[in-house]
Amino acid sequence: MTVVNEGTADIADLIKTNYQVVAIGDGRDTTSASQTGLNNFTFQKTGQVPTIVGSTLIYNVDFTGAQIPASGVSEIGIFKNGTTNGNGTLLSRVTFTNTGVVASGDTVSFTIRVEVDN
């Protein structure tokens, strides 16, 4: 059975409402489907409401150097509302090349796209 366009748009809207926590960490391993959190949580932001384009959710999140540890960050995840310290219901996680040290007055911007496919 295929989820139709209207269904994927509705699922995207449910995700938008319920998954507004974005957390960063400095873990490096690949993401497994059974994963429930970041490898090494460092900071999170709540109330991060994505924009929906069709059935794609787009999160634009900024972290300042003061929010990023000296070890840098190399993983980011989207969590269900109510998540604390990167432990909760994980929607999606990705790893990337470590940012390295970020000056406290600088900002690192992330754009995360989550596609609800049919």
Name the predicted role of every residue range.
Residues 1-74, 81-118:
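Small cysteine-rich, disulfide-bonded extracellular modules of the LU/uPAR three-finger superfamily
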